[in-house]
Amino acid sequence: MPNILSLTCICFNSVLCPTSFFFAKLPEAYAIFNPIVDVMPVIPVLFFLLAFVWQAAVSFR
C-alpha cells in the first residue's frame, strides 16, 4: 500500500509541476541526442495522421 501511495504522490507532483518534466536536460554524455529527443514526442502524432492517409488511400473501406 505505501508503494501505491508514493506512486500517486509522484504522479500528482508531476501534474502540478510539469515544467521540470518538460525542461529537463539530458546528461552531457548524451547531449548529441538533444535534437532527436526534441522530435520524439511528435512521432505518435505522425502515426495517427498516417492512419488517416492510409484510410484515404483505400477509400475509407
Curated annotation (Swiss-Prot):
Principal place of residence: plastid
Membrane topology: Single-pass membrane protein
Superkingdom of this protein's organism: Eukaryota
Organism: Sorghum bicolor (Sorghum)
Gene Ontology biological process: photosynthesis
Family per similarity comment: Belongs to the PsbK family.
Function (record text): One of the components of the core complex of photosystem II (PSII). PSII is a light-driven water:plastoquinone oxidoreductase that uses light energy to abstract electrons from H(2)O, generating O(2) and a proton gradient subsequently used for ATP formation. It consists of a core antenna complex that captures photons, and an electron transfer chain that converts photonic excitation into a charge separation.
Lineage: Eukaryota, Viridiplantae, Streptophyta, Embryophyta, Tracheophyta
Pfam family, one: PsbK
Name of protein: Photosystem II reaction center protein K
Keywords linked to the UniProt accession: Chloroplast, Membrane, Photosynthesis, Photosystem II, Plastid, Reaction center, Thylakoid, Transmembrane, Transmembrane helix
Membrane spanning residue stretches: 32-52
Subunit structure comment from the entry: PSII is composed of 1 copy each of membrane proteins PsbA, PsbB, PsbC, PsbD, PsbE, PsbF, PsbH, PsbI, PsbJ, PsbK, PsbL, PsbM, PsbT, PsbX, PsbY, PsbZ, Psb30/Ycf12, at least 3 peripheral proteins of the oxygen-evolving complex and a large number of cofactors. It forms dimeric complexes.
Coiled-coil residues: none
